Amino acid sequence: MLVIFLGILGLLASQVSSQLVGQLRPTEDPPEEELEYWCAYMESCQFCWDCQDGTCINKIDGSVIYKNEYVKSCLVSRWLDKCMYDLDKGIYHTMNCSQPWSWNPYKYFRKEWKKDEL
């Protein structure tokens, strides 16, 4: 009887832990191993960039831009198969995590940095 009880308890524990794996509470700092995913579909999120002295370097591809309205604070979250970007002020994007698509309402603000421009 004890063996059956422990077996059922183990089964329930494994189901709970597998449900938590797919969840990401709203954060401005997603896990390092997920940066490439989150930045691929909304690259103007601040966590995708290392900004200093008026320029920003992309953490994924190394591209350099001028810091301006393009780089935005973002909250990202995941629940089951829904991934969500929250840009504040009622601007958000929700997609199926397994079928993602790019979305960037700020793409027109992007200004590439050129070495000879100082």
Curated annotation (Swiss-Prot):
Any single GO CC term annotated in Swiss-Prot or TrEMBL for this entry: host cell endoplasmic reticulum lumen
Location of the motif Prevents secretion from ER: 115-118
Residues carrying a glycan: N96
Keyword rRNA processing tagged: no
A Pfam family this chain is assigned to: v110
Cell location: Host endoplasmic reticulum lumen
Key words, A-Z: Early protein, Glycoprotein, Host endoplasmic reticulum, Signal
Induction note: Expressed in the early phase of the viral replicative cycle.
Signal sequence region: 1-18
Maturation and modification: N-glycosylated.
Top-level taxon: Viruses
Functional summary from the UniProt entry: Plays a role in virus cell tropism, and may be required for efficient virus replication in macrophages.
Family: Belongs to the asfivirus MGF 110 family.
The protein, known as: Protein MGF 110-6L
